[in-house]
Amino acid sequence: MGQGCTRFRCNSRIILMTLNDEEQDILTGKSGPVARQALQHQLKVGDFFGAKDFVPVTQAHVMADTESLGEAGVRWLEGLAATSEGRRHIRVPTITDPRGTDFAKAAFLGHTPAMLDLERRAISAFVRLGVAMTDTCINYQTIQAPTRNEHVAFGDTGVVIYSNSICAARSNFEGGPSALAAGLTGRTPRYGFHLSDQRRATLHVRVERTPASLNEWGALGGIIGRIAGNYWAVPAIEGIEKPPRSDELKHFGAAMASFGSVALFHLVGLTPEAGRLCDVGHAALPGHRVVRADIDALRNSYHSTGLVDVVVFSAPQLSLFELRDLADLCVGRRFAVPLLAVTSPQVKPDSDRMGYTVRIEDAGGTVLSGMCFYQSYAREIAEANGWKRLATNSVKLVNILGGYGYQPILASMEECVDAAISGKLA
């Protein structure tokens, strides 16, 4: 396949990238206006980040919640979906992040008819484009985990950091339009974490305490995220005493990405690219140390006693085994305040079948499917239900919800369940 260096004019600026024959055809409109618009967008992104060419991707993951899309975003999707000329369907498997509601529980949450209408319109447009509405931020646990060196175009930050670090796949943080563009063209600009040199460690972190619970794993991730402090930083981490479970790594990575915009970390001796420190870095890396007092300090900064309005387990969505652990804590108990457990549409049926859902809901809890709390009109939910003080075991969630008007409180899963029963944190 031939390749040529293409000049593309954008707002009087000349963009120069090498395109192969297929990409040249897309750009000239041979595949229709939808693919052409997608590639034009990708050329601008590639130019901004200094990409020389494109890399084929095998799958894409699109941020699709309507709180982020808004009316303008949904209209844009509808315009793409209504195009009859040329090819408008995705070229590689493309799935979605959590949507903005659980339709079965929308009235309980306080979602309005206007919110639900916007959600249905977005879903319709995505489906017409060939996107699979998986509605999950844990696709690496439920759909199709990427493999080592597989180039993908993923959007959710927790998905990206897990896929890059634990699976050794290659993705940048792709914004919604960019991830959809990758699905429509089957490629993404080759920059950032698609490049081997960009994946080498830039700092070394020694951990003096291996976390014992999911909220501690999140706290450690948040601390390292703060230390790293930017998207291009890649921590190489030593001191973890035993291989973490998938759910522990999920909370660890999600918090690191939330606190520091980190997209890749290496656990020396544990993650695929870092059998030894010298595989990903060198002895002269800037060094940092995290001790138990650091973890306790972050936990305490989000902890307080007193009344609780609602308990939420979300961000990331819960795995089947997290729901099992939660269900075991609910047996024979009754909640005084609402408890929400958010999972994926792939996990929810198994939770139903295995009796976890009924145990949680018999205690007064609610199991939600296909959404994520902070992406589902969290501010409006708070106003509709009078919720202010929110307890959770998710460090990512406490980092986000302060901006939505909540007073988030970090606690363990056990402490959160106790708070739901008594209505307060001791």
Identify what each model region corresponds to.
Residues 11-426:
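Non-transmembrane, aqueous-exposed alpha-helical and coiled segments at domain scale
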